[in-house]
Amino acid sequence: EQCGNQAGGXVPPNG
């Protein structure tokens, strides 16, 4: 939920 689920959340970013 921290990384990848939100836009530009992580690597790779989802938005």
From Swiss-Prot:
Induction: By infection with the fungal pathogen Ascochyta pisi. It comes from the Eukaryota. Disulfide bonds: none annotated. It is an enzyme of class 3 (hydrolase). Keywords: Carbohydrate metabolism, Chitin degradation, Glycosidase, Hydrolase, Plant defense, Polysaccharide degradation. Its EC number is 3.2.1.14. One of its GO terms (biological process) is defense response. It catalyses: Random endo-hydrolysis of N-acetyl-beta-D-glucosaminide (1->4)-beta-linkages in chitin and chitodextrins. One of its GO terms (molecular function) is endochitinase activity. Defense against chitin-containing fungal pathogens. Belongs to the glycosyl hydrolase 19 family. Chitinase class I subfamily. This is Endochitinase A1. The lineage of its organism: Eukaryota, Viridiplantae, Streptophyta, Embryophyta, Tracheophyta.
